[in-house]
């Protein structure tokens, strides 16, 4: 299989880098890459949001602030490259064609953000579409897709299996709310829909066992194309 992993920045670096987690997923990714083609996109998470918030004191330029976030995602990506060692391509990959070339070299391409206005979820979905991946695995700080925000609603129900059309609907509903924070943003959901990409959305606990996740053994949400 060809698999794209979308690792949330807040999972990798919640406040400070989670060294044990980074070691664990690096081990899992190397193991998976022995039998499958693997590409990874890393997010900026809380650290990126802090920098972007600070930048608001100095500039109203949204594109400039997006670039700040992109640089943070690439710093996180470099951390994972270091953890993966020789199995990873030694530089942060910045475009999809290069990711394809790296895969042909039997290495793991690691990407961060690419363009202003695109989240790393959107980048991962586009990369999966470009590579014609068999599977997209989204690792987030929520253990799947819920029918409402579980941080605000203790009775929120996790959805074990949904269609991509449902994912788009849920993402758009969350995005329309003030402060809404769905597990996947609406643009990424639409790219998943367009690319007809089978997607697993899992939490940090499952991410310690990515080798099992790709076999469908997880407690997250399956998104059917």
From Swiss-Prot:
Residues given in the record as ATP binding sites: 9-10, 45, 49, 140-141, 146, 149
ATP-binding as UniProt keyword: yes
Source organism phylogeny: Archaea, Methanobacteriati, Methanobacteriota, Thermococci, Thermococcales
UniProt GO MF annotations: ATP binding; UMP kinase activity
One example of a Gene Ontology biological process annotation: 'de novo' CTP biosynthetic process
Gene Ontology cellular component terms for the protein in this record: cytoplasm
Regulation: Inhibited by UTP.
Protein name: Uridylate kinase
Function: Catalyzes the reversible phosphorylation of UMP to UDP.
Subunit structure: Homohexamer.
Protein family: Belongs to the UMP kinase family.
Compartments, as annotated in UniProt: Cytoplasm
Record keyword Nucleus present: no
Keyword set, alphabetical order: ATP-binding, Cytoplasm, Kinase, Nucleotide-binding, Pyrimidine biosynthesis, Transferase
EC code(s) of this entry: 2.7.4.22
Pathway of action: Pyrimidine metabolism; CTP biosynthesis via de novo pathway; UDP from UMP (UMPK route): step 1/1
Catalytic activity: UMP + ATP = UDP + ADP
Organism: Thermococcus kodakarensis (strain ATCC BAA-918 / JCM 12380 / KOD1)
């Amino acid at each position: 299989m060809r698999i794209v992993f979308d690792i949330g920045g807040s999972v990798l670096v919640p406040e400070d880098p989670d060294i044990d987690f980074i070691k664990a997923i690096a081990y899992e990714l190397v193991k998976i890459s022995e039998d499958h083609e693997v590409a990874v996109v890393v997010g900026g998470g809380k650290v990126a949001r802090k920098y972007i918030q600070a930048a608001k004191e100095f500039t109203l330029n949204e594109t400039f602030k997006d670039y700040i976030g992109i640089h943070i995602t690439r710093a996180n990506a470099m951390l994972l490259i270091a953890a993966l060692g020789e199995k990873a391509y030694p530089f942060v990959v910045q475009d999809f064609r290069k990711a394809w070339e790296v895969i042909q070299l039997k290495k793991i391409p690691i990407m961060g953000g690419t363009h202003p206005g695109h989240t790393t979820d959107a980048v991962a979905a586009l990369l999966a579409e470009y590579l014609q991946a068999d599977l997209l695995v989204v690792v987030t700080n929520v253990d799947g897709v819920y029918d409402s925000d579980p941080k605000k609603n203790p009775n929120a129900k996790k959805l074990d299996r949904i269609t991509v059309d449902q994912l788009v609907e849920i993402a758009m509903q969350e995005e329309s709310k003030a402060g809404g924070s769905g597990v996947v943003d609406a643009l990424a959901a639409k790219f998943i829909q367009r690319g007809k990409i089978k997607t697993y959305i899992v939490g940090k606990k499952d991410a310690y066992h990515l080798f099992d996740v790709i076999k469908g053994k997880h407690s997250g949400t399956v998104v059917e194309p």
